[in-house]
UniProtKB/Swiss-Prot annotation:
Classification via InterPro entries: PrcB_C_dom
Subcellular location field: Membrane
Stated name of the protein: Uncharacterized protein MJ1373
Transmembrane regions: 5-25
Record has Transmembrane as a keyword: yes
Record carries keyword NAD: no
Chief localization: membrane
Membrane topology, as annotated: Single-pass membrane protein
GO cellular component, one term: membrane
One Pfam family hit: PrcB_C
Keywords: Membrane, Transmembrane, Transmembrane helix
PROSITE patterns named among the record's database cross-references: PROKAR_LIPOPROTEIN
Length: 162
């Protein structure tokens, strides 16, 4: 009887360790021309005295011409942004803060990758790409978003690169 309990315990421990190992991801974060200031999954709200301009998404092809690329800083990103797809921007401390929201995604693991930010005549264009999960992901509804800042005040246009 004691031998059966030990075998059952070992079988349960092995089964649990195999299940938990499948949940661990060894994916490394790629860091380009930007600094990650805060990597927590928060969605901070905009105060009432800041102006927000809602704009709809536009989609472009990969063959865009890049003239003047700006540096940027990622302030926050995560899986629980706003429910509606689109972007908005506002100004704070001589910086333009840009928030890009994806629509409802059926699983975890979707990411927004910033390709580049170009400047033309006091207007910037943010080119981004939606990266789907590479492996199996948890079946949970998410609303991916990214919040970034650029030095200076600009009108903003965001375009998804496919």
């Amino acid at each position: 009887m004691k031998k059966k309990i030990i075998i059952l315990f070992l079988f349960t421990a092995i089964l649990c360790s195999i299940t938990l190992c499948g949940c661990i991801s060894f994916e490394k974060t790629q860091i380009g021309n930007y600094n990650i200031k805060n990597n927590s999954c928060i969605n901070s709200n905009v105060s009432k005295n800041q102006t927000i301009q809602n704009v709809s998404d536009k989609i472009v092809n990969n063959n865009t011409n890049i003239l003047n690329t700006l540096n940027y800083e990622i302030i926050a990103y995560g899986a629980f942004g706003e429910k509606n797809r689109g972007y908005y921007y506002y100004y704070k401390d001589n910086k333009t803060i840009i928030v890009i929201n994806l629509e409802e995604m059926p699983t975890a693991g979707y990411k927004i990758k910033i390709i580049n930010i170009t400047e033309t005549a006091n207007k910037i264009t943010v080119y981004y790409k939606v990266i789907p999960p590479k492996e199996f992901a948890a079946m949970v509804v998410t609303y991916p978003y990214i919040k970034l800042s650029v030095n200076g005040t600009y009108n903003v246009e965001c375009k998804e690169v496919r």
